[in-house]
Amino acid sequence: MNTIPYVIEKTAAGERSYDIFSRLLKDRIIMIGSEFNDDLANRVTAQLLFLSAEDNEKDISIYINSPGGSTSAGYAILDTMDYVKPDVRTICVGMAASMGAILLAGGAKGKRYALKNSEIMIHQPLGGVKGQATDMEISAKRIIKLREKIERFFHERTGQPIEKLKADMERDYFMDADEAKAYGVIDAVL
């Protein structure tokens, strides 16, 4: 059972209780602490749009602790990060793997961070398909196209050569925070 902590805020008007995530949102902090799926994407996208509408000059921070997940859900968040006017800072706490690493690298240049004991992992997209040969061929082409898209993204965000990215992403490629900084996924270790 997941228990969500509540905090109590005292004001001149009295006390008000918030679940911790709502309280963090008041400080323009969004938490991603699970696998990427459509529910997470809808929640985070709505939070980004809300914070941008509330103040389109003030940075938004996204803290990431995720094993990865759905690329379509992750790209919905990434596209919204690029769409909103405020800079979006990304901070890895724990792990940013797969789609989590893409989102981490997708933060505003100069504002991508990881805590010192964080772990970052990149790899080629995963997929499984059943069905007729034609369906499997369509799915394989889609995954290859997605892999090339991810390689281009990391090339643009890290400066790593495409050939190095192809080789590194052939299997799970793990980095600690300092290695992720040297690789160009993040800008600083906190």
UniProtKB/Swiss-Prot annotation:
One BP term from GO: protein quality control for misfolded or incompletely synthesized proteins
InterPro entries assigned to the protein according to its UniProt record, in alphabetical order: ClpP, ClpP/crotonase-like_dom_sf, ClpP/TepA, ClpP_Ser_AS
Positions annotated as active site in the UniProt record: S98, H123
Main localization of the protein described in the UniProt heading: cytoplasm
GO cellular component, one term: endopeptidase Clp complex
Catalysis performed (reactions): Hydrolysis of proteins to small peptides in the presence of ATP and magnesium. alpha-casein is the usual test substrate. In the absence of ATP, only oligopeptides shorter than five residues are hydrolyzed (such as succinyl-Leu-Tyr-|-NHMec, and Leu-Tyr-Leu-|-Tyr-Trp, in which cleavage of the -Tyr-|-Leu- and -Tyr-|-Trp bonds also occurs)
Subcellular location: Cytoplasm
EC annotation from Swiss-Prot or TrEMBL: 3.4.21.92
One function term, GO molecular function aspect: ATP-dependent peptidase activity
Keyword entries, A-Z: Cytoplasm, Hydrolase, Protease, Serine protease
Subunit comment: Fourteen ClpP subunits assemble into 2 heptameric rings which stack back to back to give a disk-like structure with a central cavity, resembling the structure of eukaryotic proteasomes.
Function of the molecule: Cleaves peptides in various proteins in a process that requires ATP hydrolysis. Has a chymotrypsin-like activity. Plays a major role in the degradation of misfolded proteins.
Family, per entry: Belongs to the peptidase S14 family.
Protein name (database record): ATP-dependent Clp protease proteolytic subunit 2
Organism of origin: Bacillus licheniformis (strain ATCC 14580 / DSM 13 / JCM 2505 / CCUG 7422 / NBRC 12200 / NCIMB 9375 / NCTC 10341 / NRRL NRS-1264 / Gibson 46)
Gene designation: clpP2
